[in-house]
Curated annotation (Swiss-Prot):
L-aspartate binds at residues 175, 221, 454, 495. It is found in: Cytoplasm. PROSITE patterns: AA_TRNA_LIGASE_II (PS50862). The record marks 33 as: Important for tRNA non-discrimination. It catalyses: tRNA(Asx) + L-aspartate + ATP = L-aspartyl-tRNA(Asx) + AMP + diphosphate. This is Aspartate--tRNA(Asp/Asn) ligase.
Length: 595
């Protein structure tokens, strides 16, 4: 017999009754029922119940074992009595009567429980991650991660993509976040950078004549952590294609992404035909470029109903600035003063002066609007708003006013809040859509200059003609995002592969041709030698997995994540290094100036 096991802890069934077997694993829990010991033995695959009575030669050792000890058990498979069958376990019809137990490794008193999975302080969980990973839900999440990534690889290979690995040590590149820098020992005063994404390398692969590339790519960005973003590193399904339009990228990747979700959604509905929503429409309708389309609320402009009205707060704003708009946020079934007051209080907690509203109710045979706004704008305007928004008895509508560029995020948050408060969001489905036609440039108010709105390597719609003749802020990019349930899960573009167009695009943000050659020299040189039209995208693997397993944050689907302060509590990183190491790297640490 094998030294440690003949079967795993999930393998035995009623057909194995009478067999002599050997199992090894962790003691999940021990129960004493009238002098008979029951041990739940756990391994990677599952749990099997072990029984030791006082007549068993294994009983003496069984009395000593404690939770999370590692043991080997020899014994006979027996059928459980009818009332003892555990239908929650695949092995629940059998148990092992132990004839021998060997302790392979004892365990100290646990700093956190493995059995039962109660909430526990996250820093303790991360410091003892090797114990945390034994817990059922986290263990299952990590296995789901492995299967989802394997499915991504399989699906990409099936449609003709080839997997390439690109360098981890590369040059620093301004791609929107801070780089992690690696000092060079050989080249004094010089630094490598960990790649924020394989952006330039995958484009170089297209120039090199490879047609379809993909990679499960590690990416490194020194940015502040959020619930939907891990500090330090993350992984993406990175891909690039030659001789394609953006429509062909969508048509290629939509079946892949839909298939991944369907395979792991556990029966939840998945969007069959992904909508394509222009960025400007997404902002005006949902207040976000990553809208949760499970929320049925759609905003509309109602500026005309307030212009010249008796509601002077909005009317005066409209009169003083033609760019001012009023947006309406409909709230089906939200027509109670209590709900409207809660929304108003929430708006104030978000730093807003309030959230104006109208709600409608039947007065006899007549449907009337109520609230301060209805009183001030009058019955005719109130009815016009109700008709435009398609509202009825028991519904409400909230209003925000000002410059859309200033208030759209708050309006989107109000839409989200109303949808959640009124239980309008169907949480048991995955709603995917493409957001397209992103702006190419944006105005950087802090530095009073033009900047790229998204990927600087995107092709502007209209090419050189647009760069030379259009208002920069009106130029759109061949840039697109894939969104799901309020998260951006992928981003991509058709690339700017023409050297003269590339230089002109960077000139608009204050970078000269020399700057372009210095910062993106490899890519710029490559484009001098015949670059095919190409494009691609990158899907955030961590976010996709988080959505599919229903985790509350990314640390719940990652093996060894850092905490919210970007500290690895298990490995104690970042850490001090020796003076000799610093000397080899030509680094001298200056005292930290305390403010």
């Amino acid at each position: 017999m094998h030294r440690y096991r003949s079967h795993t802890c999930a393998a035995l069934r009623k057909t194995d009754v009478g067999s002599n077997v050997r199992l090894s694993g962790w003691v999940h829990r021990v129960r004493d029922h009238g002098g008979i010991l029951f041990i739940d033995l756990r391994d990677h695959y599952g749990i099997t119940q072990i029984v030791a009575d006082p007549d068993s030669p294994a009983f003496k050792v069984a009395e000593t074992v404690r939770g999370e000890w590692v043991i080997r058990v020899d014994g006979e498979v027996k059928a459980r009595a009818g009332d003892a069958v555990n239908t929650n376990l695949p092995t629940g019809e059998v148990e092992i009567f132990a004839t021998e137990i060997e302790v392979l490794a004892a365990a100290k008193e646990l700093p956190l429980p493995v059995f039962g999975e109660p909430d526990y302080p996250e820093d303790i969980r991360l410091k003892y991650r090797f114990l945390d990973l034994r817990r059922e839900t986290l263990h299952k999440n990590i296995m789901s991660r492995t299967k989802i990534i394997a499915a991504m690889r399989r699906r990409m290979t099936e449609i003709g993509f080839n997997e390439f690995t690109t360098p981890i040590l590369t040059a620093s590149s301004p791609e929107g976040a801070r780089d992690f820098l690696v000092p060079s020992r050989i080249h004094e005063g010089k630094f490598y950078a960990l790649p924020q994404a394989p952006q330039q390398y995958k484009q170089l692969l297209m120039v090199a004549g490879f047609d379809r590339y993909f990679q499960i790519a590690p990416c490194f960005r020194d940015e502040d952590p959020r619930a939907d973003r891990l500090p330090g590193e993350f992984y993406q399904l990175d891909l690039e294609m030659s001789f394609v339009t953006q429509e062909e990228v969508w048509e290629t990747m939509e079946p892949v992404m839909r298939g991944i979700f369907e395979e792991f959604a556990e029966g939840k509905p998945v969007t069959q035909q992904f909508r394509r929503i222009a960025y400007d429409d997404a902002i005006r309708t949902y207040g976000s470029d990553k809208p949760d389309l499970r929320n049925p609320i759609e905003m509309q402009a109602v500026t005309e109903h307030f212009a010249g009205s008796g509601f002077k707060v909005f009317a005066n704003m409209i009169a003083n600035d033609p760019k001012v708009e009023v947006w309406a946020i409909p709230a089906k079934t939200g027509g109670s003063r209590a709900f409207c007051d809660r929304m108003n209080s929430w708006a104030q907690s978000e730093g807003q002066p309030g959230l104006g509203y109208i709600f409608w109710r039947k007065e006899g045979d007549k449907l009337e609007g109520a609230g301060p706004i209805a009183k001030n704008i009058g019955e005719e305007r109130t009815e016009a708003i109700r008709t435009q928004m398609g509202l009825e008895d028991g519904d409400a509508c909230f209003f925000v006013a000002g410059l859309p560029s200033k208030f759209y995020k708050f309006a989107g948050d109000a839409r989200t809040r109303a949808g959640e408060e009124l239980n309008l969001v169907d949480r048991d489905r995955f709603e995917l859509a493409w957001i397209i036609d992103f702006p190419f440039y944006e105005w950087d108010e802090d530095n009073k200059k033009l900047d790229f709105a998204h990927n600087p390597f995107s092709m502007p719609q209209g090419g050189m003609d647009a760069l030379e003749n259009q208002d920069p802020l009106a130029i759109k990019a061949y840039q697109y995002d894939l969104v799901c349930n309020g998260f951006e899960i992928a981003s991509g573009s058709i690339r700017n592969q023409l050297p003269d167009v590339m230089v002109k695009a960077f000139e608009k943000v204050g970078l000269s041709q020399q700057d372009v050659e210095e910062r993106f020299g490899g890519l710029y040189r490559a484009f001098q030698y015949g670059a095919p039209p190409h494009g691609g995208m990158a899907a955030g693997i961590d976010r996709v997995i988080m959505l599919l397993v229903g985790a509350k944050n990314l640390r719940e689907i990652s093996l060894f994540p850092m905490n919210q302060q970007a500290l690895d509590l298990l490995m104690n990183a970042p850490s001090d290094v020796s003076p000799a190491q610093l000397r080899d790297l030509h680094i001298r640490l200056a005292p930290v100036q305390k403010s």
